[in-house]
UniProtKB/Swiss-Prot annotation:
Disulfide bonds join 24-45, 27-32, 38-63, 67-78, 79-84. CDD domains: TFP_snake_toxin. It comes from Bungarus candidus. InterPro entries: Snake_3FTx, Snake_toxin-like_sf, Snake_toxin_con_site, Toxin_cobra-type. It is found in: Secreted. Keywords: Acetylcholine receptor inhibiting toxin, Disulfide bond, Ion channel impairing toxin, Neurotoxin, Postsynaptic neurotoxin, Secreted, Signal, Toxin. This is Weak toxin 2. It comes from the Eukaryota.
Length: 86
């Protein structure tokens, strides 16, 4: 009986997907504090920085499924821990 109960608990945990959900920063400011909870399939935080002509460097932050490739005049930083895309 105990074995059956233990098996049911394990199956319930696997089926419910009680996994970890990543949180990333999502604002363009340098001192960004706005946090976003990523979707289950998004396991990476991204910060894309690019030159905005005479306005200086700008950044985009958010969640991603995979780390994007950098475009010309752009840097991309990817990480996989909470709020790591500062």
């Amino acid at each position: 009986m105990k074995t059956l109960l233990l098996t049911l608990v394990v199956v319930a945990i696997v089926c419910l997907d009680l996994g970890y959900t990543l949180t990333c920063l999502i604002c363009p400011e340098k001192d960004c504090q706005k946090v976003h909870t990523c979707r289950n399939e998004e396991k990476i935080c991204v910060k894309r920085s690019y030159d905005k002509n005479q306005l200086g460097w700008r950044a985009q932050r958010g969640c991603a499924v995979s780390c994007p490739k950098a475009k010309p005049n752009e840097t991309v930083q990817c990480c996989s821990t909470d709020k790591c895309n500062k």
